[in-house]
From Swiss-Prot:
It holds the Pfam family TruD. GO terms for biological process: tRNA pseudouridine synthesis. This is tRNA pseudouridine synthase D. The active site is at 76 (nucleophile). Responsible for synthesis of pseudouridine from uracil-13 in transfer RNAs. It comes from Wolinella succinogenes (strain ATCC 29543 / DSM 1740 / CCUG 13145 / JCM 31913 / LMG 7466 / NCTC 11488 / FDC 602W) (Vibrio succinogenes). Belongs to the pseudouridine synthase TruD family.
């Protein structure tokens, strides 16, 4: 997908190689583990392995089925990652003989429950940018200040769409009955990619609208956004945040909490700037709460009623936390540390920073 960036700076030149040395991810658990129970939680460091491959390695060694192993989220293959997996505690003794060149078990602790998908708070990242000139490093510092203030769009990253970038196309064919996939897990995975594609296209369209409101007078903007009355365009332009909240928008308490429909636009826009709430985009499917009014007019083109998977809402905007940057001039390297809520992609932040698509080695 050709992404639309919300910031307006020129592209910044640097090299990013997604390798275990230059890309480190640490999962932050949703809650502390209790120290007692029938499950054994393993804190594992892996490199050059996907989470699925890690699960297969562990299940083979332990002699158990893959579905008996729990994990909170999928971690990148081309990275050094730290994440938690759970196994039935009765198989813990077999770990004494476990040895793998790309996997190290750092900690073990008992817990009452199996780890489930989504049971994480977020992820902490370390990223190294290479071939970075002093001038471009200064540009990065300026852009990072904007990101600290306003946040970034919560696009799904390229990883969501598979190695060939076409998982969403297969998902659309499944939804429309044009292709069959026998594996329920694979089917859900591909349909999820299609939902993600629709979300990204909606978010791109909304950023386009926000840019129109920033760059044109209300009368000029009305020709480019004819679904919105001129008086409403004027009100939207007064919102302080670059991403404009529309009447009838579904909003989400940030980063966790309930969703609700925007009503008091002045109050909601203030809370958005204060990082208390954010717009929530649609993952098209059944049982998802619908937006209303003008917001629904912009959402409707990205709803596919053929999708029978359950729909939901996803944060459309996120605020990176603990964002730190340092430049090592003698090596022409920049080093970034930051935290993102679960489900968000570090590569999306890097592309917003670079203002261009990042070529992944």
């Amino acid at each position: 997908m050709e992404r639309l960036y919300y910031l307006n700076h020129a592209p910044i030149d640097f090299h990013f190689a997604q390798t275990p040395r230059d890309f480190v991810v640490e999962e932050i658990p949703l809650y502390p583990f209790s120290g007692a129970g029938e499950h054994l939680v393993l804190k594992i460091r892996k490199r050059n392995l996907s989470t699925f491959e890690l699960v297969d390695i562990l299940s083979s060694h332990l002699g158990i089925k893959s579905r008996e192993i729990g994990y909170a989220g999928l971690k990148d293959k081309s990275a050094l990652t730290l994440q938690h997996l759970s196994i039935p505690a009765k198989f813990g003794d077999k770990l004494e003989a476990f040895d793998h060149p790309e996997v190290k078990i750092l900690e073990q602790v008992r817990h009452e429950n199996k780890i489930r998908i989504g049971h994480l708070k977020g992820n902490r990242f370390f990223i190294r940018l290479k071939k970075l000139s002093p001038l471009n490093s200064l540009k990065i510092q300026g852009v990072l200040e904007e990101i600290k203030r306003w946040g970034i769009p919560n696009y799904f990253g390229y990883q969501r769409f598979g190695n060939d970038g076409n998982n969403h196309e297969i998902g659309r064919k499944i939804a429309h009955g044009e292709q069959r996939v026998t594996s329920p897990k694979r089917r859900t995975f591909l349909l999820s990619a299609y939902q993600s594609k629709l979300f990204n296209e909606w978010l791109k369209e909304r950023i386009k609208l926000s840019k129109i409101l920033a760059e044109f007078t209300p009368s000029e903007a009305s020709r480019l956004a004819p679904m919105i009355p001129v008086e409403q365009l004027k009100a939207l332009q007064k919102q302080p945040h670059p991403f404009k909240i529309l009447p009838g928008e579904i909003l989400h308490h940030y980063p966790h909490g309930k969703i609700f429909v925007a009503e008091d636009m002045e109050e909601e826009s203030r809370r958005f700037v204060e990082k208390d709430i954010v717009p929530a985009g649609l993952l098209s499917g059944t049982k998802a709460k619908s937006s209303e009014g003008i917001a629904h007019l912009y959402e409707a083109p990205f709803i596919d009623e053929k999708i029978q998977e359950q729909g939901s809402r996803r944060l459309a905007w996120i605020f990176p936390e603990d964002l730190e940057y340092r430049y090592i001039e003698e090596e022409a390297h920049g080093e970034l540390n930051f935290y993102l809520p679960k489900g968000s992609y570090a590569t999306v932040l890097i592309e917003e920073l670079a203002h261009r698509e990042i070529k992944i080695d």
